Amino acid sequence: MNRIYACPVADVPEGEALRIDTSPVIALFNVGGEFYAINDRCSHGNASMSEGYLEDDATVECPLHAASFCLKTGKALCLPATDPLSTYPVHVEGGDIFIDLPEAQP
């Protein structure tokens, strides 16, 4: 895994999301003080998940076609999406957030 620095904890208030411009682009969410990182692109359409509608049950709804995804597993919960989103481990160290990304393939 390749651990990257994402941002200070204060940059992602509870109930909010932040787009992290890395490769791949990540959507970082704060749900009740727990942080989740998923691929920022909806698996159904070309929409930014960081602009989606965050629910208290750690799900996010795509802003384009209302597909819903579990932030914990990336699983698509309803149509029109059927493919899951990639999820990434998140670590809080002090006041900073780090995300583990897979190693780049040669």
UniProtKB/Swiss-Prot annotation:
Biological process, per Gene Ontology: 3-phenylpropionate catabolic process
Alphabetically ordered keywords of this record: 2Fe-2S, Aromatic hydrocarbons catabolism, Electron transport, Iron, Iron-sulfur, Metal-binding, Transport
Binding site for [2Fe-2S] cluster: 42, 44, 62, 65
InterPro entries assigned to the protein according to its UniProt record, in alphabetical order: HcaC (IPR023739), Rieske_2Fe-2S (IPR017941), Rieske_2Fe-2S_sf (IPR036922), Ring-hydroxylating_fd (IPR053387)
Taxonomy, superkingdom: Bacteria
Molecular functions per Gene Ontology: 2 iron, 2 sulfur cluster binding; 3-phenylpropionate dioxygenase activity; metal ion binding
Note accompanying the cofactor annotation: Binds 1 [2Fe-2S] cluster per subunit.
Cofactor: [2Fe-2S] cluster
Metabolic or biological pathway, per its Swiss-Prot or TrEMBL entry: Aromatic compound metabolism; 3-phenylpropanoate degradation
Family of the protein in this entry: Belongs to the bacterial ring-hydroxylating dioxygenase ferredoxin component family.
NCBIfam families, A to Z: 3PPDioc_HcaC, PRK09965.1
Function recorded in the entry: Part of the multicomponent 3-phenylpropionate dioxygenase, that converts 3-phenylpropionic acid (PP) and cinnamic acid (CI) into 3-phenylpropionate-dihydrodiol (PP-dihydrodiol) and cinnamic acid-dihydrodiol (CI-dihydrodiol), respectively. This protein seems to be a 2Fe-2S ferredoxin.
This protein's name: 3-phenylpropionate/cinnamic acid dioxygenase ferredoxin subunit
UniProt source species: Shigella flexneri serotype 5b (strain 8401)
Gene it is expressed from: hcaC
